[in-house]
Every structure is written in C-alpha cells, then in structure tokens.
C-alpha cells in the first residue's frame, strides 16, 4: 500500500506529501475526522515514507526492511500508544518519555501513533503536553481524533491540523462492489447509512452478511421500543442489562439502534427503498413508525447519538444507557 491507495483524502495527503518532499515535517500532527476514513492508514504510510530506504513519489517503497516491518506493525520506531482498558494513563506517558530519551533505533524518525487520542485521561493529557512542548529530536507524533474538541485546547494548539473528509456514498458503494463483491443494491444502501466511513461500511457489510450476529441486539431494540407504549420505566431500565459489555459492543448496539430509528423514519415518510434492516423486521418497524409523532423518533435518534458520544467520553456505561431510556420515555409521552 502507498499514499495513492488511500481513497478520498487527496487534500490531506497532498499537504503531508509536500511536507515530506521538502523535508519539513512538523513534529506533531492532528488527524481529524470520523473513524474508518483513512487516518490510521495515512499515519502508517507517513511512518514508511519517513524511514524508507528507497522512497518514491508515492511514499515508501513497500519492499525494504523498514517498510515491511511497519506494515506488520513490528518496527522498533513505530510506537502505537493504546489505552489500558479504557484510558491512556499517565504511567504510559511516563514510559513513553523514557523511550523518547533515546534516539530512534533503526530509522531516521520514530513515529508515535495515538490511534484514539481522546482516550488520554486528564493527567496523561497534561503530562503529554509537556512532551509536545519540548519534543526530543527525531520523534514525530500523530494524534487521531474524531473532533478536536475531544482534546485539551493546549494539546490541539501544539499540533498541525489535517482534516480528513467523509467519503462520498458513490465512492463507498464502488469500493464495496470491487473490494467485497457486494451486489450493487446492497452496496448502495450500506453506502447511504455508513456516514461517509469506509471502515463502518465494511463493518456493516460483514454484519449484514452474518445476519444472526445482529438479531439478538435488534430484537432487544425492538422489544424496548415497543415497551415505550406501556408508560413504565421499570421494564426499560431492566432491559439495559442486554447492552452492557465492552465499549466496542456497546457502540455496536447503539449503531444498531440508530439504524433502527432511521429505518422507522424512512418508513414513516414512505421511503421503503431506503430501509436497511432485513425485510423480515419491516412489519414491526412499520407498527412502531406511526405509534408516536415523528418528533419522538427524531428526538430518539438524537438521544442515541448523544449516548454514543457519552461512551466515547468515558461516562459511566450503565448511567448512559439508563438515561437514554429515561429520556426516550419522556419523548414518547
């Protein structure tokens, strides 16, 4: 892979390539944009270009020892800072500082990649700020975020911002067909609900193809939404246990919920051709669509979006789910 293989990010990659060509790479970059649109791939290609023994116009050569090690994520000068459980801690930053005290092992530069920089807790973020203010030579930082508002403003100010754009539905649809062999109709539907994220589109394609993996979660959502009409909170709160799990599992559950409400809104407005969920659920969705005013479902969609943001910000998961359903019940009555 090289820079040219990263789809839909010509502007961000163009800025980065010009800096590499002129040997004027900034010490810290902030890659901004939704997940699944090429930020991490771009950071890895930057690591290749910085340390490749035979770099070309498209970055690394993909054949030298350095490029191959980076591709396999085993290069000693590629430091991937990941959260311990749910957060990047101050102890991890201190370990990183010890590592940065030494020059790069085998390449010109060491690249420190924070795949989810928003996972820095407040103590780690403040400690990391000192590192960015006085960066040891030979070290480049790449911080990946959905929104710069997720970070301390002082951290953002130390970085050069590169904005990554959501991909167009046409591009996502074409890639689903060529890369995964999707039929055109399914590719078109998935591309419309992917939010411009190729990673999410691939994920939806796989989950949709393995329909059983969605059924349990979807059944929980339909049951909860049907329980709204009872006007009682106890069954709604009791149902929260179905969704408590890892952060990835909870985000997937919210993704299914947002898809469910989106389909309800499509059905309510007579746009059946835009419905994403399997046809066997259509009658239950139709039954829900006209049970409440449209504003109830619009409010519900916003509440799910807010719950997903709360989980990203480390809000207590059980509290997040409980407040979601309390507010959904309020919106319904």
Predicted regions and their residues:
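Short capping loops/turns at secondary-structure boundaries
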Residues: 86, 118-121, 144, 148, ...
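Catalytic acidic motif of RecA-like/P-loop NTPases
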Residues: 115-121, 126-133, 149
């Amino acid at each position: 892979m090289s820079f040219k293989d990263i789809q839909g990010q010509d502007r961000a990659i163009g800025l980065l390539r010009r800096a590499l060509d002129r040997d004027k790479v900034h010490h810290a970059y902030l890659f901004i944009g939704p997940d699944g649109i090429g930020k991490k791939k771009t950071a890895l290609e930057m690591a290749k270009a910085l340390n490749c023994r035979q770099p070309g116009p498209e970055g690394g050569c993909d054949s030298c020892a350095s490029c191959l090690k980076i591709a396999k994520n085993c290069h000693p000068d590629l430091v991937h800072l990941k959260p311990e459980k749910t957060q990047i801690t101050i102890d991890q930053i201190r370990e990183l500082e010890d590592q940065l005290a030494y020059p790069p092992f085998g390449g010109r530069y060491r690249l420190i990649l924070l795949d989810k920089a928003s996972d820095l807790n407040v103590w780690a973020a403040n400690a990391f700020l000192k590192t960015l203010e006085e960066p040891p030579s030979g070290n480049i930082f790449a911080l990946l975020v959905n929104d710069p508002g997720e970070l301390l403003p002082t951290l953002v100010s130390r970085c050069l911002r590169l904005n990554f754009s959501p991909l167009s539905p046409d591009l996502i649809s074409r890639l689903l067909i060529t890369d995964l062999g999707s039929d055109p109709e399914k590719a078109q539907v998935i591309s419309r609900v992917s939010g411009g994220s190729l990673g999410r589109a691939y994920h939806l394609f796989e989950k949709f193809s393995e329909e059983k993996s969605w059924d349990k979660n979807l059944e929980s959502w339909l049951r909860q939404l049907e329980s709204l009409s009872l006007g009682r909170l106890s069954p709604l709160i009791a149902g929260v246990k179905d969704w408590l799990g890892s952060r990835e599992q909870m985000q997937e559950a919210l993704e299914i919920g947002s898809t469910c409400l989106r389909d309800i809104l499509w059905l309510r407005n007579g746009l059946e051709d835009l419905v994403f969920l399997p046809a066997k659920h259509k009658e239950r969705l139709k039954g829900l669509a006209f049970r409440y005013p449209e504003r109830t479902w619009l409010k519900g969609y916003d509440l799910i979006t807010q719950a997903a943001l709360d989980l990203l910000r480390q809000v207590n998961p059980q509290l997040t789910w409980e407040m979601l359903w309390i507010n959904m019940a309020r919106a319904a009555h």
